[in-house]
């Protein structure tokens, strides 16, 4: 029997939950839902995307070590482009500008204050003809 999984909630290692949350809210447009640095964990969200920010004491012995990459799958090239422009205007730390990749993703990358990256993409492989997918290395 297959299980239907809910949305994944990645844990992002940060040096300070409060400072990281401020960046995610003020620059990247997330909402800060709960938590603080004293407790070691905080929750942020934007639409259906939820993430946990955790500091070193919280992660000691059982948490991830950074930096990490979180992939955010958007619904169109236009959404990717619009988000890139919005985050660029907000002075997000752009790691890689938006472009179509040879693996048929339109993507860009930004970093947070601790070097963790959000890799925003749209998979346009399904829009290509079977012949073009084959030539691009994505034969089915």
Identify the meaning behind each predicted range.
Residues 20-25, 87, 112-115:
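Conserved active-site tyrosine of GNAT-family acetyltransferases
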Residues 1-21, 69-72, 123-140:
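N-terminal beta-strand motif that seeds the catalytic metal site of vicinal oxygen chelate
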């Amino acid at each position: 029997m297959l299980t239907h999984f809910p949305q994944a909630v990645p844990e992002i290692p940060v040096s300070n939950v409060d400072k990281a949350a401020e960046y995610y809210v003020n620059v990247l447009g997330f909402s800060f839902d709960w938590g603080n640095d004293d407790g070691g964990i905080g929750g942020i969200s934007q639409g259906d995307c939820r993430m946990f920010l955790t500091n070193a004491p919280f992660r000691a012995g059982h948490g991830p070590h950074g930096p990490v990459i979180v992939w955010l799958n958007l619904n169109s090239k236009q959404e990717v482009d619009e988000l890139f422009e919005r985050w660029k205007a907000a002075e997000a730390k752009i790691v890689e500008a938006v472009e179509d990749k040879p693996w048929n993703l339109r993507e860009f990358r930004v970093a947070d204050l601790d070097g963790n990256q959000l890799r925003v993409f749209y998979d346009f492989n399904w829009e290509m003809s079977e012949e073009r997918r084959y030539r691009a290395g994505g034969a089915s």
